[in-house]
C-alpha cells in the first residue's frame, strides 16, 4: 500500500467504498424510481459520506477535462437525468430545466431548492469528478428513500464546464434562475479571466435566461463580490435588485443557508455578500 495515496490500494476503505457506490450509481442513476420500485424492496440507501469523495477545492476551467456534452440543446437527453418527467408515449419530456446551479459543489442548494420549487426541474453543473459523483449518489439515495412521495425527482447534476459549454445544454431564454454560489475567487490578477462572471460569459448567461430571469450571486470574498457586481452592472442586459427585494426573496434565504460553503462561513462568523440581478428584455431595434 502507498501510504501517500490510499486510493492506489485496491483494498483501502476509500477505494472499496467508491467501487460500491459506482456499481450502485450505474444501476440506479437513470432509473425511474417510484412506489413500484420503492427503495429496492424496502431497503434504505445510506447518504454518501463526503470523506470518501476527496478532491481539490477548485478545478482549472480552461483545462481539457474530456467532458461529454451535446452538440446542441436539441441533442441533450434529459430523460436520463429526470426519468420521472419523461412521457414514454410521446417520447418527450413533460418539463424543461428552468433553474441552474452553476458550480453546485456538494449539492446543498439543489437539495433545498427541490421542495421549494416542486414544479421546476433544477440542474446542478459541477466540473470536479468526485464532487459530481457525491451529488449523484446523494440524489439517488434521496430519491430512493423518498420514492413513496416522489421527492427529489426534479433535481439532478451533470459534470460540465459552464464556462465553455452552457449554450450546448440550454435553449435561448430557457432558464428563469441561475445561481453562482461561492465561486472560485481566483485571487491572482492573471487568473481573473477564469472567474465565472465576466463580460463575455454574462452575454451567454443572458442568452439562456428568459426576460426577468434572475442571476443570484453569493460569496464570502468582498473583492470577488465587487468584481461580480461591477461586471453585472456594466452589462446592458442586467439590472440589480435592491436590498429589500433580496431580503424578501425566498431563493436568497435558501442560498444563504443551504450550501456547504455557506454553512462553513456561518461557523466561522464570516460575511456573506449577496447580489441579485434581473435579466432585462433585449432593446428594441429601431
UniProtKB/Swiss-Prot annotation:
It catalyses: guanosine(46) in tRNA + S-adenosyl-L-methionine = N(7)-methylguanosine(46) in tRNA + S-adenosyl-L-homocysteine. InterPro entries: SAM-dependent_MTases_sf, Trm8_euk, tRNA_(Gua-N-7)_MeTrfase_Trmb. Keywords: Methyltransferase, Nucleus, RNA-binding, S-adenosyl-L-methionine, Transferase, tRNA processing, tRNA-binding. Pfam families: Methyltransf_4. Pathway: tRNA modification; N(7)-methylguanine-tRNA biosynthesis. S-adenosyl-L-methionine binds at residues 103, 126-127, 161-162, 181, 259-261. GO terms for molecular function: tRNA (guanine(46)-N7)-methyltransferase activity; tRNA binding. One of its GO terms (cellular component) is tRNA (m7G46) methyltransferase complex. Its EC number is 2.1.1.33. The keyword Nucleus applies. Forms a complex with TRM82. Belongs to the class I-like SAM-binding methyltransferase superfamily. TrmB family. Catalyzes the formation of N(7)-methylguanine at position 46 (m7G46) in tRNA. This is tRNA (guanine-N(7)-)-methyltransferase. It comes from Vanderwaltozyma polyspora (strain ATCC 22028 / DSM 70294 / BCRC 21397 / CBS 2163 / NBRC 10782 / NRRL Y-8283 / UCD 57-17) (Kluyveromyces polysporus).
